[in-house]
Amino acid sequence: MTLLTVKHLTITDTWTDQPLVSDVNFTLTKGETLGVIGESGSGKSITCKSIIGLNPERLGVTGEIIFDGTSMLSLSESQRKKYRGKDIAMVMQQGSRAFDPSTTVGKQMFETMKVHTSMSTQEIEKTLIEYMDYLSLKDPKRILKSYPYMLSGGMLQRLMIALALALKPKLIIADEPTTALDTITQYDVLEAFIDIKKHFDCAMIFISHDLTVINKIADRVVVMKNGQLIEHGTRESVLHHPEHVYTKYLLSTKKKINDHFKHVMRGDVHD
């Protein structure tokens, strides 16, 4: 069953009249993971942020965005806020930017839960701890009393995921969630998303420039370049049998990097 339909989506910078995204179309079914790939500036993030109205006001949006039967572009800002977090959760690139540095992470998470649920304080704490345990966050009560600066980037990232899961959204949008992390933490966060994909009835849009990450988690893939969607299909067709020259370029670049790394590890790179 289709959860999200995006039709003829166009995003324009109203200050300069410059089109940033042009005539983008895609769908997402319930429980499916859609990978969105492309270089920096290709329009990946603003396309996905437009689903819940998180772009700056200067960016004008036209077209259709239908989420679970509701036209998102016809909603007022106050109506859209009801969808954010509860029905559509967003996991940002850097956990440090998602939390107010002057307040404990627990207080911020509790406030979000109170806005979107009718749970008591005790129920909220129990629910948050349950999902923090699920994501291997040790000593959750201590973490909830911590300020953001006291926690690592990987911990903050997993806290965002825990909060998202606690609200039981129909869709999680993950915007480059592994980019700002070290290699080991990247692996842990990616494994968390893969586990969510297996065990939760939740669709995901996973934005990344890392083709290895997308290959591990996506069911279908769309490729963006200069604000246009230039190729889409199953993970197998796009990442292993691409048709567009740009997709082939991305894949060949990734292969060259991997081959060079293998040569370095073998010690057969010479000046």
Curated annotation (Swiss-Prot):
InterPro entries: AAA+_ATPase, ABC_Ni/Peptide_Import, ABC_transporter-like_ATP-bd, ABC_transporter-like_CS, P-loop_NTPase
EC class: translocase
Alphabetical list of Pfam families matching this protein: ABC_tran
EC number: 7.2.2.-
Bilayer topology term: Peripheral membrane protein
Record keywords: ATP-binding, Cell membrane, Cobalt, Cobalt transport, Copper, Copper transport, Ion transport, Iron, Iron transport, Membrane, Nickel, Nickel transport, Nucleotide-binding, Translocase, Transport, Zinc, Zinc transport
Binding sites annotated in the UniProt record for ATP: 38-45
GO BP: any one term: cobalt ion transport
Location relative to the cell: Cell membrane
Domain ABC transporter: 6-251
Tree of life domain: Bacteria
UniProt GO MF annotations: ATP binding; ATP hydrolysis activity
Chief location: membrane
Function: Part of the ABC transporter complex CntABCDF (Opp1) involved in the uptake of metal in complex with the metallophore staphylopine (StP). May be involved in the import of a large array of divalent metals ions such as nickel, cobalt, zinc, copper and iron. Probably responsible for energy coupling to the transport system.
Family from the record: Belongs to the ABC transporter superfamily.
Binding partners and assembly: The complex is composed of two ATP-binding proteins (CntD and CntF), two transmembrane proteins (CntB and CntC) and a solute-binding protein (CntA).
Protein name: Metal-staphylopine import system ATP-binding protein CntD
Organism: Staphylococcus aureus (strain Mu50 / ATCC 700699)
